Amino acid sequence: MLTQLINARILTPQGWLKDGSVLIRDGKILEVTNCDLAVIGAQLIDVKGMHVLPGGVEIHAHGGGGRDFMECTENAFRGAVQTHMKYGTTSIFPTLSSSTVPMIEQAAETCTRMMAEKDSPILGLHLEGHYLNMAMAGGQMPENIKNPDPNEYIPIVENWHCIKRWDAAPELPGAMQFGKYITGKGILASVAHTQAEFEDIRTAYEAGYTHATHFYNAMPGFHKRREYKYEGTVESIYLMDDMTVEVVADGIHVPPTILRLVYKIKGVERMCAICLLYTSPSPRD
């Protein structure tokens, strides 16, 4: 089936294209052009100046629509995912905060089952914790926070292949071994809820930690201890040229001036925006 969107405001790598046209065949984009002449045989859809842009890939969200992925049930997952689908997201990595092993296993079972469905928007499970620095716990559940334990994480990784990302504080005992192990299994290791300094970050990067979770949040920046000044986690991550970062781009978690700084240093290829949505009715909240 051939479909043509006309009178669209289209986001392209070169910027916004006004009064453009998108030609689609069987769900695949064939052409984006500033010519909105009707194509013979195409079903015309006049979007009347509305925005047309690529679907969002949400890499860090804890829930939505009044549901939390930590409920671990299929109903909770569906409710949250469907909420994201209403607002431009087309695929998602459901995120768990620091959890117990039974919670992780239940969520992983739900995730695995739903990923097997035709055209599933779920790309994998993201574990934010529970190997985090207690001093930087923030909104995490402190009773679940601990140091990396291979007797715990190895069986989880071996049994549940839906896990695609796991966050940790690299300064913790055992964190380097953890990073090397999970990256060897194809899981993204990300720095999170941490007090890591430059040597910690440099060593972590070499051990496989290539991403930073909600950059600037739950991690220190430049600081002073007595008469000496030290770089923080933030500056250390900037110095890792190929390390990617995610930012909560709501203007509250990170102010607009800092967002511009992140963009200026990391560039569009090494940063992304996340919504970090919990159980709010919609991302707008």
Regions found by a protein language model. Give the residues of each.
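Active-site core of metal-dependent hydrolases
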Residues: 158-277
